[in-house]
Design a protein with these regions (language model features):
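N-terminal cap/lid segment of alpha/beta-hydrolase-fold proteins
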Residues: 25-87
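Short beta-strand element of the alpha/beta-hydrolase
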Residues: 90-98
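Cap/lid segment of the alpha/beta-hydrolase catalytic domain
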Residues: 100-109, 126-152, 194-198, 226-229, ...
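Short amphipathic alpha-helix adjacent to the substrate-entry channel of hydrolases
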Residues: 107-125
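Primarily recognizes the serine-hydrolase "nucleophile elbow" in alpha/beta-hydrolase
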Residues: 152-242
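Short beta-strand/loop motif that positions the catalytic acidic residue
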Residues: 249-251, 255
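Conserved alpha/beta-hydrolase "acid-adjacent" motif
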Residues: 256-262
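C-terminal catalytic histidine-bearing segment of alpha/beta-hydrolase fold enzymes
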Residues: 264-319
Length: 319
């Protein structure tokens, strides 16, 4: 936990320093991709403590030799839907970018992920959830951990799942094959929405008649799950139970931001609750590598996910 707090800037700090800014503008999805408002205009949702207008800031720091983009100060969350390519399997994945609940690594851990999964016949949706301070986070102003008064990120995640299911016919989705995939803070969000059957907001329209829990969950290099001392209990999460969906966890042992015990403690809780779970740990790989392939074996994780989705019956049997 101490290491997580001290090195959180590996992902979030770059977005907060002028030296890292190449250009800034409001983020838009790739051409041809539909971006929809997550909430009706009349919905009374909490507003994060923003520093200004929403902006997408290209970072000078490189991942696999390429820059990445951080979205800051999101007040109006959206869902960008990438249609399945080829034979539609009916599977849908909602992607939660990481960024310490302060910014969103929108391409590295968002749009690029959808580009990788849609060729498998999977509909993919990137959630641009509210930040900053929408989940438990490290606040530089007080040099302390803070929890939001309203679980804004969790509310956005639940709403995104309900919204996808409500429009399943339109997007060719099987409402019983809707999963989540999150990185870092987004990994915590994947775990949180997987263990919270109760809606954390007042329903706003007919879409909220749908279930809020996903049918499967992918948790990559998560944070905020371990108290730094005990492996017997998960922190910042509703109780893990047999109702938690099948889960895939992946992390590197040399992760400098979130200790590998973040994954281990969650794995042990799932194991105890008899939830089908796969845990993949690698000696090397670091943090925030997204879906960008390098010489590190861990970056070839998408092939493991594809095999796992076949194994749990989400994707049809492999030929």
């Amino acid at each position: 936990m101490i290491r997580t707090l001290a090195l959180l800037g590996v992902v979030t700090g770059a977005a907060m320093t002028d030296a890292s800014i190449v250009h800034a503008a409001q983020w838009q999805p790739p051409s041809g991709i539909e971006q929809i408002a997550l909430w009706p205009d009349a919905a009374a949702i909490a507003r994060p403590e923003v520093r200004g207008e929403e902006r997408a800031v290209e970072q000078a720091s490189l991942v696999a030799g390429q820059p990445w983009t951080a979205v800051e100060d999101v007040v109006r969350p959206t869902l960008s839907v990438f249609p399945a390519k080829g034979a539609n399997t009916g599977v849908a994945i909602v992607v939660f970018p990481g960024g310490g609940y302060n910014v969103l690594a929108i391409d590295l851990e968002g749009t690029e992920v959808c580009d990788g999964f849609t060729p498998l016949g999977i509909t993919c949706a990137v959630l641009k959830y509210r930040v900053p301070g929408s989940g438990e986070h490290w606040d530089k102003r007080c040099n302390c951990r803070r929890k939001p008064r309203e679980p804004m990120a969790l509310q956005d995640a639940q709403r995104a799942i309900s919204l996808l299911r409500s429009r399943a016919g339109e997007w060719g989705i099987d409402p019983h094959k809707v999963g989540v995939l999150g990185f870092s803070a987004g990994g915590h969000l994947s775990a949180a929405v997987s263990n919270g059957p109760t809606r954390r907001y007042v329903p706003v329209d007919g879409a909220d008649a749908q279930r809020v829990r996903p049918d499967f969950s992918l948790v990559l290099y998560p944070g905020h799950l371990w108290d730094g001392r005990h492996l017997e209990q998960v922190t910042n999460l509703a109780p893990v139970s047999a109702a938690t969906p099948p889960t895939f966890i992946l992390q590197a042992q040399d992760d400098p931001v979130d200790d590998v015990h973040e994954s281990i403690v969650y794995y042990l809780a799932l194991l105890k609750a008899q939830v089908p779970v796969e845990l993949h740990l690698y000696a090397h790989g670091g943090h925030a590598f997204g879906m960008r392939a390098t010489a590190q074996p861990i970056t070839h994780w998408p092939a493991l996910v594809e095999t796992w989705l076949h194994a749990i019956g989400m994707l049809p049997p492999a030929r």
